[in-house]
């Protein structure tokens, strides 16, 4: 046990980034939008280079974020049913279902990042990981401010 230590966890970090930035094949934008991903690793948030920026449209939800949203809704339903289970077998059934959906959502990144796979897109994969790094760094800076 350690004093003054807290655990911090992002629920489904990569799927959350897909949804938060509307990251999808058809939503990539050639012009700047509010959904921007900085593919470089800046030391602080003021360091950005435009050649390392990827933008995603904000006017319509992309195919990938829609899929994440629908799966999150389905997973929440399975978790609700698990909570209401009357016996161990029912609990196990709904727990297995929600875990399957969780793994499916997590696999989206792998499918996009796997070169040679039909849906692979290095820029999308990099946008997801860059967004995740940014979220982790923002959380770390926020936590440091609280000290």
Give the residues covered by each predicted segment:
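Conserved acidic
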Residues: 1-147
